[in-house]
């Protein structure tokens, strides 16, 4: 059974489902937080509709690469489905996770993506939800739901934003 996404080379949803509960248990035992970043590419359907699915695939691969380049080597990156990704960050509190999410959001949006099949470059942005395991008894489903809820708050607030679960939204910048 594959644990990596064949398109992007990062872990897949199955891997996260299998390993997140273990990481959470270690977090409780060590009393160190685990942060979850859940993000997706804003208006990704437009990329596919305008440039084709091949270009969409290139964008997904490059977003995965940029994500990996902006994280520590022990953070876990996974494609959760479609254009949605998850980052699991052990030993990371809410403030540190928010700072990493903002850096990632800015870096993805600042660099253009070269379109190999056309003489064009495109820019994409991402919206990010942040949640932190905040106590013994939290479940993987609960932390993922908090991250997902924060992600959708970021999207409802105009996209290209980071929102932390349980924290008032900070201005983009």
Named regions from a protein language model:
Residues 1-7, 14-26, 33, 75-76, ...:
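Signal-transducing coiled-coil linker helices
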Residues 59, 72, 86-106, 143:
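Short helix/loop segment flanking the catalytic signature motif in cyclic-nucleotide metabolism enzymes
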Residues 90, 98-101, 131-173:
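Catalytic-core segments of nucleotide cyclases and related cyclic-nucleotide turnover enzymes
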Residues 44, 63, 77-80, 85, ...:
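Hydrophobic framework residues that shape the active-site pocket
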Residues 79, 108-126:
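Catalytic core regions of nucleotide second-messenger enzymes
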Residues 1-18, 39-53, 61:
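Conserved nucleotide-binding and Mg2+-coordinating catalytic segments in signaling enzymes
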Residues 64-65, 96-114, 148:
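Alpha-helical scaffold within the catalytic cores of cyclic-nucleotide enzymes
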Residues 19-51, 67, 78, 97:
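Active-site-proximal structural segments of metal-dependent nucleotidyl cyclase/transferase enzymes
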